[in-house]
């Protein structure tokens, strides 16, 4: 605190001498900012503020994990700069229209008045405001207007989620034109990376050891640090797999299991089949998620859940499922519908159980009571995933946890396991996974694509669901178990108030109990579970696959090898196609081989 006071004192003395007289510039009288509006700062915010006031940079990039308080940090900076006349007005640039209102409300707690209704068509604003709220799209549509405003008075420009500044060349050019002459620029992001090579405006890039340019932050506060400080919640991922069946345009029928090593096309179609609201997978997962939410609400009565859908059609279908299954109509938010912002605010302040949204709520929107999520979208870039999960991590009290239900798809499981990994934006990456980023463009204006062209000729035939594994703190727990089973109930019934260490210990105990029961069943079994009600070929294949996946899970926990690696090794040893195309004899051979391997390691 001593360092904070010293830095602030140096800052005040210099600014009071330098700014004893100023001109209004025809834009109205600068409103005073009261020193009584100083909400308490978290540790990282205080350290970053000391760094900022001590160095007085023109450009500053703060990277802080979603939910850690970037907004409050920026508003405190703005209040300090206004109070000592370093700047005379503030412009905050955000991705969506809803965030304009959200920021304006937050600013009031810091003694600041920001105009959320400022429009390009009518650029006048009341002199009672300290500044204005605008979107990236709004700036891009008329950069000259915003350049004139910025040049007329000493301006602090705050960029919320600055990675959007690289969404298009025209956007980047517009932002540079509008705010190139700003007195101060403060950039914020929880995800300082993109899926393309578009440079982010006003962000510094430095070459790494390989000569590749990487973005450089002035202050970084990651998820792991925030978790240790109790600023964010621990996140538990419940990954659901299952057999998916579909028909292509030629009439050929296919079957595959989510989570198996599959081609990109097979993975996409199995994933799409699972997310079909008319199938069996989504109702089963929604049932499990609602059960988990009810468990949390026993300790946190206003805890809420959110389903993130791919498009408007499925969002409405999921809402109908929720209404039928829970006897409570959820809040539905579609960014192209009038009143969507008001519905988000109403849900955030209420106690309703479920919200269904199409991407709009996945970034920046503050709904602290969200504790359970269903990731029912096919978006899989690190940027979108990180922003989506960020909606659930904001901590309100010690011990709160977040539970996210995801399809057991390899790239999602990898992202879930690497939640604590720090990423930077890299320019010129040699092998980029995809040039398409689902967050490209302004989320407020982006079209929420309906299912169509790519899915014509594709027919989902159904998918069952089973809990494949639980991921926490980068580790996998549990083995595959059907929905509705006692083993699934053990994981869904985890207490709602646990810190990270308690959660880790409990998951280890649940896993040990599950593996012990499975081992006892294996010792007592004399025949594979392929008789009785499973006399059909389809039933036998289903049971054999389930048995194999259970053994693969056991091998995974014993060896630390990924599920996919174990499947590939079995194919190398035993031969044959991927499991979805394997015969009963081929699957039995893999089961025998894996049992032998497991017994050798026992």
Curated annotation (Swiss-Prot):
Superkingdom to which the source organism belongs: Bacteria
Biased composition, class Polar residues, residue ranges: 523-534
Biased composition, class Basic and acidic residues, residue ranges: 430-439
InterPro entries documented for this protein: Helicase/UvrB_N, Helicase_ATP-bd, Helicase_Restrict-Modif_Enz, P-loop_NTPase
One of the record's GO molecular function terms: hydrolase activity
Domain Helicase ATP-binding, residue spans: 51-210
Gene Ontology cellular component annotations, sorted alphabetically: cytosol
Region Disordered: start-end pairs: 430-452, 518-538
CDD domains: SF2_C (cd18785)
Protein family (similarity comment): To M.leprae ML1624.
Name of the protein described by the UniProt record: Uncharacterized protein MT2985
């Amino acid at each position: 605190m001593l360092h904070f006071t010293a830095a602030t004192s140096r800052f005040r003395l210099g600014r009071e001498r330098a700014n004893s007289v100023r001109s209004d510039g025809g834009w109205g009288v600068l409103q005073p900012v009261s020193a009584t509006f100083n909400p308490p700062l978290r540790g990282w915010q205080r350290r970053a503020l000391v760094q900022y006031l001590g160095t007085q940079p023109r450009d500053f990039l703060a990277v802080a994990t979603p939910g850690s308080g970037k907004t409050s940090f920026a508003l405190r900076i703005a209040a300090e700069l206004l109070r000592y006349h370093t700047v005379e007005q503030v412009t905050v640039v955000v991705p969506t229209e809803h965030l304009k209102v959200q920021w304006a409300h937050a600013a009031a707690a810091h003694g600041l008045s920001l105009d959320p209704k400022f429009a390009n068509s009518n650029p006048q604003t009341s002199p009672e405001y300290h500044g204005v709220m605008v979107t990236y799209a709004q700036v891009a549509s008329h950069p000259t207007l915003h350049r004139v405003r910025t040049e007329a008075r000493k301006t602090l420009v705050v960029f919320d989620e600055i990675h959007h500044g690289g969404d298009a060349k025209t956007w980047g050019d517009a932002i540079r034109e509008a705010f190139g002459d700003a007195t101060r620029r403060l950039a914020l992001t929880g995800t300082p990376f993109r899926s393309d090579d578009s440079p982010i405006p006003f962000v510094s890039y430095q070459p790494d050891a390989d000569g590749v340019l990487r973005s450089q932050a002035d202050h970084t506060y990651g998820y792991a640090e925030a978790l240790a400080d109790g600023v964010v919640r621990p996140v538990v991922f419940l990954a659901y797999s299952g057999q998916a069946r579909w028909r292509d345009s030629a009439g050929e029928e296919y079957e595959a299991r989510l989570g198996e090593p599959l081609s990109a096309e097979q993975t996409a179609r199995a994933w799409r089949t699972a997310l079909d609201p008319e199938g069996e997978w989504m109702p089963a997962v929604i049932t499990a998620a609602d059960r988990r939410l009810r468990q949390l609400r026993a300790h946190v009565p206003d805890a809420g859940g959110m389903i993130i859908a791919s498009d408007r059609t499925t969002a409405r279908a999921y809402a109908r499922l929720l209404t039928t299954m829970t006897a409570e109509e959820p809040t539905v938010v579609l960014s192209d519908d009038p009143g969507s912002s008001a519905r988000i605010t109403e849900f955030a302040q209420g106690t309703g159980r479920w919200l269904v949204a199409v991407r709009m709520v996945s970034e920046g929107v503050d709904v602290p009571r969200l504790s359970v999520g269903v990731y029912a979208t096919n978006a899989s870039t690190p940027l979108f995933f990180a922003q989506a999960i960020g909606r659930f991590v904001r901590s309100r009290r010690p011990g709160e946890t977040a539970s996210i239900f995801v399809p057991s798809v390899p790239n999602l499981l990898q992202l879930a396991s690497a939640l604590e990994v720090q990423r930077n934006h890299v320019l010129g990456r040699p092998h980029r996974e995809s040039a398409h980023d689902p967050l490209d463009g302004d989320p407020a204006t982006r079209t929420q694509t309906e299912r169509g062209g790519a899915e014509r000729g594709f027919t989902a035939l159904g998918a069952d669901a089973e809990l494949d594994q639980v991921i926490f703190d980068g580790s996998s727990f549990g083995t595959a178990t059907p929905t509705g089973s006692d083993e699934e109930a053990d994981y869904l019934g985890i207490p709602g108030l646990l810190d990270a260490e308690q959660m880790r210990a409990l998951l280890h105990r649940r896993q040990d109990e599950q593996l012990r029961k499975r081992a006892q069943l294996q010792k007592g079994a004399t025949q594979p579970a392929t008789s009785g009600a499973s006399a059909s070929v389809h039933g036998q294949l289903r049971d054999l696959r389930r048995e194999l996946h259970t053994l693969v899970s056991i091998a995974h926990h014993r060896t630390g090898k990924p599920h996919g690696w174990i499947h590939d090794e079995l194919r190398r040893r035993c031969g044959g196609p991927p499991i979805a195309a394997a015969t009963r004899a081929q699957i039995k051979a893999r089961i025998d081989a894996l049992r032998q391997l497991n017994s050798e390691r026992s």
